[in-house]
Amino acid sequence: MEKGDSAIELEKKFSRGKTYLLSENGFFLFRFVDGAFGSKWCGFWDRDLKFLEYFAFRVDGEWLCPENFKRFIYTGAEALHIHSLFVGEVTERVVVGDGTLIVNLKLPRRCEVLVEVGVNIRRREEGIHGRVYNIISRSESVEVMNELGKIEIGVRGGEFLPNPRREIHFPGRYAMEHGYDFRWYEDEQEKFIPGIFRFEGRELKFWAGKKAGAGHILRKKRRKLKEKEKKTENWKLASTLLSFYFEREYAGFLAGFPYFNQFWTRDFLCMFTPLIRAGFEREAHKALLAIARHQLSDGSIPVIVGSEKPCADSTPLFLLACYKAFKSGRKAPMKNVKMALQYGVEHFDGELVEHDPRTTWMDTLRRGYAVEVESFWAKAFEVWGKLFKNKKLLFLSEKIKESLISSYLQSGVFLDSLKGKYKFSVNSLIPLTYSVVRTDEENIFKRAKEELFCNFGVRAISRREVGDDYHARIWGISTYWGLKFLSRHNPEEARKIFVNYLKFMGSRTVCGFPETMKESGEVEGASSQLWSVAFIPEMLQELWGRGRS
């Protein structure tokens, strides 16, 4: 740590169940604050490809472990684990760079240190895979590879003693014991241990991936943090938002950690405007152009960049983001815009745009003609119709708006969908929140206040219709949409809810915001989600007129 660095410090008694994340350009380390690699999602990753299960140090016969863990310090650029051993205090300093993981171990005196590394080169969705590993041994390093990839691991000034073996273990038992929910899908994993590193001295440097200097990496990361902190006015927000972004063969934002470690177009496009307002204008526009390059041949936008899986809402959201980019003076991918518009035209059935009912943001529910999807299409046809002076697009927009009023509006409230299980949801607010149609808002505001709002967020589905089912809970995206609607009617109430929402920062992952919460306050799902945090600077600006530390 350098003098002047902002930091979070956690003593052992306050660290139970907490995790942290160090990320750089798609490479990330996810781990428990007490040093445990207690989940199948813990370890060193390159986006959705895992490389390391864990690394472990034995100092003069004593392993660094949660039992002798003492204190944790996090700056966003580095993490420090302080352990109390028989030999004295040992500090483990961890840094992640572009393609590299570096750990410096500072010892109280000259000690013998053994280093064990569990390798598990696998895809994100895999468990035990049985791939064959090969190793190339060197004096102070070893290269481990299988058909998916390879990684070099080393200890500077150490000696590598090859003894390859593979074992089955269940790291997720630790996460389950610490209250992590079933959506982490913990199961048995395999680890390949290539051998042991032996080292003697007072300071050990362990590295995995590319060889690099920790000092250079830290200077670069601190510069980035300072630059973004000026925009967000909060170093924690700056650190968290930076963790999602990568710029490799294409640019993008990972949807969430630890297991939404892919570029989900919907999540990003919902947060396109908030990211710009958070000071990520360059990054957001680069990611938008990457989505354009991965557009499917029929003109639609897939749910995940690089996949063929369809998505109900990403295509109109893409059109709205491109329009915003164009109006701000940025170059918009017009060929892709026209393809996406044509896709919408071809799927217009006379009143609405057809979509797969299984591919809305509530993807565990079937929601045919979802109100938010139709609203996004109506707005997309409207803005591009005006820009292109295209009467057909304007006609389609008006037809969808007419259907929203005639088919969805019942007793002053918009239905969630025409073919779905639930009637009133946060999606019902979208036609008004995004100024798609105009109607009296008194009844929908009253219903939203009674059925969707709680003291720290906004439910996705009416509490009158369902309890704490998965998609009914308080989500980051539902809170964003709900607060935008509420701020028009009762900004003071919106401020109160938002202030309470902010208290969930770091509830599981240091500086991160969880994917979803129950009304009881119990957090669930991914522990650091893009659309749970990216809108915070925008709401601070809208509700207070400025940033807030």
Range-by-range predicted roles:
Residues 301-302, 342-345, 349-359, 366-370, ...:
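Catalytic cores of carbohydrate-active enzymes
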Residues 216-235, 273-289, 438-447:
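Carboxylate/His-rich catalytic cores and anion/metal-binding grooves
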Residues 248-258, 265, 360-364, 463-467:
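Short glycine/proline-rich turn/loop motifs
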Residues 6-51, 56, 189, 287, ...:
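Aromatic (Trp/Tyr) and acidic
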Residues 1-231, 266, 277, 281, ...:
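Terminal accessory carbohydrate-recognition/targeting modules of carbohydrate-active enzymes
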Residues 215-261:
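An acidic-aromatic substrate-binding cleft motif
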Residues 114-117, 218-219, 285-288, 393, ...:
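Composition- and surface-driven signal marking solvent-exposed, interaction-prone regions
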Residues 261-355, 370-374, 473-487, 491-499, ...:
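Aromatic-rich carbohydrate-recognition surfaces in CAZymes
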